[in-house]
């Protein structure tokens, strides 16, 4: 059995997703990831990652035979293309410095065949930051979260605790006032070094282990 990633272009109307997933389920194929959106031309787009496929060509032919399906394309999975994700959240000045370190280190590992991608969002405000932290748990393939700011606590700290508890995501924080440093897995003073260490913590091609430094400050 094999795995496959498909992008399916469809007409945009109710019931299309149900029809497509019905075809897939009838073959005992497992859907491991799905993403739906409407393209600029008004057509529906469904991206799916599937596993336990006995006959890939037969599945694709069945999908193409549907009157609601306009096109089907095969891809490598997002895990294979973009790999693990590191999310950097906080103030713009700090986020940019953390991103510099993370991108430089990710480049070293990606050259060796690994795939690590860096996502950033500069935000201010306790409520906005807490909401963004909680939303990290709903994003796919997130391996680490870096909190890059000058003061974080309260609702942000509670959001970090939730993300760690429910999604087992490594959290690295810059050294700053506020209680968030008490719940982070690692606290780093230099923002560029924080970015570097976030990549080292999740890379399969690194010898660094977050377990050996968990709870420490640098």
Curated annotation (Swiss-Prot):
Pfam families: ACT (PF01842), DUF5612 (PF18462). Coiled coil: none annotated. InterPro entries: ACT-like_dom_sf, ACT_dom, CheY-like_superfamily, DUF5612, UCP006363_ACT. Residues 5-77 form the ACT domain. It comes from the Archaea. This is Uncharacterized protein MTH_1235. It comes from Methanothermobacter thermautotrophicus (strain ATCC 29096 / DSM 1053 / JCM 10044 / NBRC 100330 / Delta H).
């Amino acid at each position: 059995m094999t795995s496959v990633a498909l992008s399916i272009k469809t007409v945009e109307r109710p019931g299309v997703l149900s029809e497509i997933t019905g075809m897939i389920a009838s073959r005992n194929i497992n859907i491991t990831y799905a993403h739906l959106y409407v393209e600029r031309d008004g057509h529906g787009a469904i991206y799916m990652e599937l596993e336990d496929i006995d006959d890939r060509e037969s599945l694709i032919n069945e999908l193409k035979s549907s009157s609601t399906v306009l096109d089907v394309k095969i891809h490598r999975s997002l895990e294979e293309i973009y790999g693990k994700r590191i999310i950097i959240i906080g103030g713009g000045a700090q986020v940019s410095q953390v991103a510099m370190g993370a991108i430089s280190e990710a480049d070293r590992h990606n050259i060796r065949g690994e795939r690590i991608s860096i996502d950033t969002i500069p935000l201010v405000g306790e409520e906005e930051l807490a909401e963004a932290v909680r939303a990290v748990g709903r994003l796919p393939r997130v391996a680490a979260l870096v909190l890059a700011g000058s003061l974080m606590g309260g609702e942000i700290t509670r959001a970090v605790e939730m993300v760690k508890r429910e999604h087992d995501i490594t959290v690295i924080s810059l050294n700053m006032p506020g209680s968030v440093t008490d719940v982070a897995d690692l606290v780093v003073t230099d923002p560029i070094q924080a970015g570097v260490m976030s990549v080292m913590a999740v890379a399969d091609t690194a010898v660094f282990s977050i377990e050996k430094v968990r709870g420490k400050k640098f």
